[in-house]
């Protein structure tokens, strides 16, 4: 609850900051001073937090500008800032991205900061054509239109399975909450982690160890089962799958993907994979004790028919 309240407070501050910036469109140094006066001081922040804050302050006015152009040109696209938590990133750094939404189909895209800034530049050129009564922008080919992008799979949310039970050769089974980038619940995902022998047979009760250090120097095997899920949003029924990687085994660090199941919001993948470690090290024990496997639930999106929504843009 405290985290949710903090996020609401930060969003409110961001909205206030954005209003001030547009009321006083001056220099970047002024924006920095204003940010500090609005509660965005960089004092006491980590390097990652300071970088994120700088990118947020940079992107907020750009996003507002692009949304205004989209509405003016009836492009039926809406943009918003998105923060992807460090825990879900391979480099353990928070990622600042921009989400584009097709307000007609509901399709979503996540753009890297650099891609958005490049698109914004082209959008500015398109808007200048509009202001100059140059109607060539209306016949811009789809693949040249800065508001268009290929439909791609979208991350519904992530679920984290903590690994501490593996330190004691114990099974882990849970129905985990699927959480999106806003921290909102989007469904649940059933995951099972089962320590096993080299043939994939589950360990017996006698194989339990009280001290994780007993595993050091020995081989270790674990089965990762992605069983089933329940997803709440009906627009994601075109196809659902799960992808994940395991930081404690070299051959499993790359993302493994389940099969895609279509036409359902309650997919049952029954996907099983055995991961083997040749020799447990102190580093692996540390991972077991403190880390998790992040499972990302992905949704297949379908392109629209190209027609504009039947309601005015401002009502979408």
Q: What residue spans do the PLM features occupy?
A:
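Long, low-complexity, serine/proline/glycine-rich intrinsically disordered regulatory regions
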Residues: 1-68, 75, 194-196, 204-220
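Peripheral membrane lipid-binding modules
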Residues: 48-51, 55-57, 70-95, 99-184, ...
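Alpha-solenoid helical-repeat scaffolds
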Residues: 161-217
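Extended alpha-helical scaffold domains
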Residues: 206, 215-227, 266-274
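A structural signal for beta-strand and strand-to-loop patches characteristic of beta-rich domains
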Residues: 211, 221-224, 255, 262
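Short amphipathic, basic-aromatic surface patches that mediate peripheral association
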Residues: 225-235
